[in-house]
Regions:
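A juxtamembrane structural motif centered on a specific transmembrane helix
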Residues: 37, 235-294
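Hydrophobic alpha-helical segments of polytopic membrane proteins
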Residues: 49-66, 70-119
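Hydrophobic, glycine- and aromatic-enriched re-entrant/interface helices and adjoining loop segments
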Residues: 96-192, 216, 220
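Structural signal for the C-terminal ends of transmembrane alpha-helices
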Residues: 22-32, 81-94, 200-212, 270-278
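Hydrophobic alpha-helical transmembrane segments
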Residues: 185-203, 263
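Loop-to-helix entry and N-terminal half of a specific, functionally important transmembrane alpha helix
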Residues: 208-253
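Membrane-interface segments at transmembrane-helix junctions in multi-pass inner-membrane proteins
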Residues: 1-26, 37-50, 65-72, 136-138, ...
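Transmembrane signal-anchor hairpin modules in multi-pass inner-membrane enzymes, especially those
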Residues: 28-55, 94-98, 278-294
C-alpha cells in the first residue's frame, strides 16, 4: 500500500485494526438467541454470538491470507485464540477447562492444516529442512539460513563477526533480519541487550494488562501486546535459525519509516488506555456474564 511517496505493508495496519474490531465484538451484550444444530443426531445449542465471532475471525484470517502472508495469519489466529481465552476467564474463572478444550481443538486443527500443506506442497518440507540443515540447500532455500549460521558461529562479543558471510546482503533482504545484522556488525553484547530489552518490554506489557481494571481496556491491551510479543518472539527465533522462515519483524527494531510510525501510534494507543487504568467508564454488574462497559 502506498501513502504519498512511502510504501507500507497492508498487514501492518490491518492486523491491529482487526484486533481492535474483534475486541469490540467480544464486548457486545450477550444475545440469548441460540441456533440449534444436530451433530451425530444429537441436538446442540450454539449461541448466536459464538457463531458470529467464529465467522468474523475466519473472514479476517482468510483476507489476510490472500495477501499472502503466512506470518500475519499465524499472528492473527493466535491473537484471536488468546483474546477469546482471556474473555472466557474474565467472565468466569472456572472456564479454564473450556479454554483448554478450545486450545486442544485449535491445536488439532492447526496440526491437520500443516500436514495437509506438507502433503500437497512437498517443497515446503525442503524449506523447513533448510532452516535446520542449511548446508544441504546452500544454493537455494538454505542460502539465508546458512549465512545466518555463519554469522552466529563466528560472532564476537563486540565488533564484527569473523565470518561476515553476506551480512550486508542479509540486511538488504528486508527488515526481518535486523537482529542478525546487528549481531554481525556489533557483536553478542549489543544483540543480547536488544533481546533483553524486548523481553523487559514484553513483561511490561503483560503487567500493564493485569493492572487495567476495565474489561474492555484489558482486552485491548492483551490483544495489542500479544501482537507485539508474538512478532518479537517469532522474529528472534527466525533470526537464530530456530523458527520458520516468514515475514516476521521486530517492532521498533526492524527498520522502515512507515512501519515505525504505525508501531508508535499503536504504542500511544496503549499508553492512553493505561493512564486510565483505575477508571471505569460505566458502572458494571459483575455477575456470571461479561461486563458491557468500557
Amino acid at each position: 500500500m502506498k501513502i504519498g511517496n512511502r510504501y507500507i505493508s497492508a498487514t501492518t495496519i490491518a492486523i491491529p485494526l482487526y484486533i481492535i474490531s474483534f475486541v469490540g465484538f467480544l464486548m457486545e451484550k450477550n444475545i440469548k438467541d441460540f441456533w440449534k444444530i444436530k451433530i451425530l443426531n444429537k441436538p446442540i445449542k450454539v449461541k448466536y454470538n459464538v457463531i458470529k465471532l467464529v465467522l468474523l475471525a475466519m473472514i479476517s484470517i482468510v483476507l489476510i491470507g490472500m495477501l499472502p502472508s503466512k506470518a500475519s495469519v499465524m499472528i492473527l489466529t493466535l491473537n484471536y485464540l488468546i483474546l477469546i481465552s482471556a474473555k472466557m476467564i474474565l467472565i468466569q474463572k472456572n472456564n479454564i477447562k473450556t479454554v483448554l478444550k478450545l486450545w486442544g481443538i485449535a491445536l488439532i486443527l492447526g496440526i491437520s492444516f500443516v500436514i495437509c500443506i506438507l502433503v500437497f506442497t512437498p517443497y515446503q518440507v525442503e524449506r523447513i529442512d533448510a532452516i535446520f540443515n542449511p548446508e544441504k540447500y546452500a544454493q537455494d532455500e538454505g542460502w539465508l539460513a546458512l549465512n545466518r549460521k555463519m554469522i552466529i558461529n563466528s560472532a564476537q562479543a563486540f565488533g564484527e563477526a569473523e565470518d561476515m558471510g553476506n551480512a550486508n546482503v542479509l540486511l538488504d533482504e528486508g527488515d526481518n533480519y535486523a537482529l542478525v545484522s546487528v549481531l554481525a556488525h556489533y557483536g553478542w553484547v549489543i544483540s543480547s541487550a536488544i533481546v533483553i530489552a524486548i523481553i523487559l518490554f514484553s513483561c511490561k506489557l503483560i503487567l500493564d494488562a493485569v493492572k487495567i481494571k476495565d474489561e474492555y481496556g484489558k482486552l485491548l491491551i492483551i490483544g495489542i501486546s500479544t501482537m507485539f510479543i508474538l512478532e518479537s518472539i517469532l522474529n528472534i527465533l527466525m533470526n537464530f535459525n530456530l523458527g520458520i522462515e516468514a515475514d516476521f519483524s521486530i517492532p521498533f527494531i526492524s527498520y522502515g519509516e512507515m512501519n515505525m510510525i504505525v508501531n508508535l501510534a499503536i504504542l500511544g494507543f496503549l499508553l492512553s488506555i493505561y493512564k486510565r487504568k483505575d477508571i471505569y467508564m460505566y458502572e458494571c454488574e459483575r455477575e456470571n456474564i461479561a461486563s458491557d462497559c468500557w
